[in-house]
Amino acid sequence: KPWKMMGRMHDKYLIADGKTYILGGRNTYNYFLGDFPGHKNFDRDVLVVCDEPQKDNSVNQLWNYFETIWEQEDCRYFHNSKKLADRQSVKKAVLELQEGYQQYFEVNKEKICDTDYADETFETEKITLLSNSIHTQAKEPVVWYQLGELMKNAKERVKIHTPYIICNDMMYNTW
């Protein structure tokens, strides 16, 4: 069905140990990873640590979102066959990734192992995760509406930290 061809999951998140997650905006195309002159695009990742995970928090909200996605009819393994893993090109790619990680780790191990994330993060009063409806067809702007409602309730200011939004002039000037 042509209207489903572009239906893909673009979510990037990693949930660890039931109390920590990373929301990512990291894209792997060279435009985003390379060091090119001119316009520089910075993808941002958001680290969230919930010291005391309660029932109503963003860690559990993200976990429930994952479960909902996982159960969708459209969600399935792209390739899950032994034949694919046995291909020489796949074996080569796996080896390149392993070697690349090892090199990265050797150069950055102090940052990786000795970073006190509590010193490099700040406490929030509230984290609200938003998403549009979960289907492959065109979507209504539900997230934009939800953002507007949250902004209307702000006491003093609104700070949006997300790797996913690109605002146009109308969006900046609406609320």
Question: Residue locations for each model-derived region?
Answer:
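Charged, low-complexity intrinsically disordered terminal segments
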Residues: 1-12, 16-175
